[in-house]
Structures are given as structure tokens and as C-alpha cells.
Amino acid sequence: MTVLMAGCGDLGTEAGLRFAAAGHRVMGWRRSPEKLPAAIEGATADLSSGELPPIPADTTAVVVAIAADSPTEAAYRAAYVDGLSNVLDAVLGSGAPVRRLLFVSSTAVYGDAGGDWIDERTTPEPGGFSGRIIREAEELLSRRLRGTGITPVVLRLGGIYGPGRTRLIDQVRGGSAVIPAESRFTNRIHRDDAAAAIVHLCTMDFVPAPVYLGVDNEPAEMGEVLRFLASELGLTLPPSETAEGATQGEVSGTAQAGGTQGGGGPKTGEPSRGGNKRCSNALLRSTGFEFTYPSFREGYRAILAGVGVRHP
């Protein structure tokens, strides 16, 4: 099988390496393909520009793993809507026997659920522009692939953490972490599990569902995660926020840390992409997928032990 990774940053590269290890040919599109490991055939591509290289004639699976250049509405639209549209144009015009196309999305499409449980049946109600634009991209994917014979799969990831993604660890070490006064759930997935889920959904024998939530087994309150990290690091527990006690900077810092890594957040004036919800991964697990890092505890212990590298 030949797999096209349209967008090959840290997550896409890790997924590509896993496809290659399973014996598949992998083509990676990115602006700087010289940074890709030898197992991935690189090609220069700017997804948002529409100037894309030829798709290998034997491509049967496509993974679209896009990241916005900056946390602005324009950047999100250029990446997720324009970029996806350009990839779809290339795929549909290629004549390649593509049978499955997976779009890496985000749980930001759900917005804030007041701490309630959500799953794939929950109606998306994004609270900020990032979630709205990503949801627009999901709808574009479904509309464009309808009747083409290509199965669209949307993988809505929670906050990605892993090697080199150490924002919360750095906050605890630096003393800027603050435990929120209000109970607020966060949902995350280790980079390696996210990559493994991509490979699993693209290669499993039976037809996948239209949407899966890519989160670990345990939604966790932010305070619980911060206390755990402090304990693992042998540091004093972070202070708790009070109605009058925390500065605005402290509040903003914790809100940003709870969202999807690297996106949205207070810098843009929109609510944190993470929201307050508990995401269920039951549907993903029902396919036979198994997590290497079923909760934040195993994942952060691996990071603190220096396991893995972040791909450039």
C-alpha cells in the first residue's frame, strides 16, 4: 500500500514512520521535505497554496494532518479549509485508487460541555473560531467525497502531548502553574498513540466509522494533572487559584495550557480550545485499538524519562 501524508510535521512524521515499519510505501508532503527521515519519501508542498506535487499513481490511503501557521482565524482558514480543499482537488483529479482518506481534526469542534461526557454522537457546538473552521473542514470533506468511492474518516484528537511538548511540565518547573479554582476537565492523547490510531484506522480490514474521538482513557481535571507532575518532579504543589487570588496572567496561562497543544487560546481572544468536557474513546477502542499510554500518568512519566523524540 502507498500512503500519502499530506502534512508531515511531528505527528505526520511519526505516523509515516509507523506506516513504513509496517511495510508500506510512504510519501510525505511538507514545505521542508529535507527534514523527513529516510523511510518517508519527501516532496515539497504548501497545502494552502494549491501548488501540489503529483500523487503517486498507486496511492490507496491519504492522511491529511494540517497545522495552522499561527493561532489566528486567517491562518486556520488557510490551513484547514483551503489546505484540505487543495488536497481533495489533487486526490480527486489524480486517478489514483484511493480508498480511504483520514482527516486529523480536533475535539475543539465540541466547544464547552460543562464537564459532561461527549462522544461521536454529540452534536458539535464549537465555541471559538478554531473549532468552527475545523468543523467547516470536516463538512467539506464529507461533501466532496460523497459518491466518490473514497471513505472519509475524521479523527478528532484531544490535546496532543509527547516528546518536546512540555508546556505543563515547564509551567510546573518554572512555578507559573496555577490549579484552577473551578473543576475543569481536559482531554489529551500522547503523540505516539495519535500516530498509532491514524495507522490503525487507515489499515484495519473493516470499513471505519465516519468519526472517531482520539483521546486517552481518562479525562482529567487540570489540577489533578498539575499535582501529579509536581509530585513526579519532586516539587512543591502549585498554588490553587481563588476568586481574588490569581492574576490574569496566571488564569490565562492555565487556560491556554488546557487546550489542544499549540492552537487557539487567549492570544487570539477566543476561548480555550479545550473547553470543559469529558471525551469518550469507547468507539476507537471497540475497533481493537490499544493505547500505549492509557492515561496522562504513563505518558508524562515516559516524557520525563526521555522516551522518544519530537520530529522536526
Task: Give the positions of each predicted feature.
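N-terminal Rossmann-fold NAD(P) dinucleotide-binding loop
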Residues: 12-13
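NAD(P)-cofactor binding segment of oxidoreductase domains
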Residues: 59-102
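Conserved Rossmann-fold NAD(P)-dependent oxidoreductase catalytic core, especially the SDR/UDP-sugar
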Residues: 86-129
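Catalytic helix-loop patch of NAD(P)-dependent Rossmann-fold dehydrogenases
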Residues: 114-154, 179
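Glycine/proline-rich active-site loop of Rossmann-fold NAD(P)-dependent oxidoreductases
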Residues: 135, 148, 160-173, 200-212
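A conserved pocket-lining segment of Rossmann-fold NAD(P)-dependent short-chain dehydrogenase/reductase
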Residues: 170-191
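Mid/C-terminal beta-alpha module of Rossmann-like enzyme folds, strongest
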Residues: 197-200, 204-268, 280
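C-terminal amphipathic/interface module of NAD(P)-dependent oxidoreductases
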Residues: 272-312
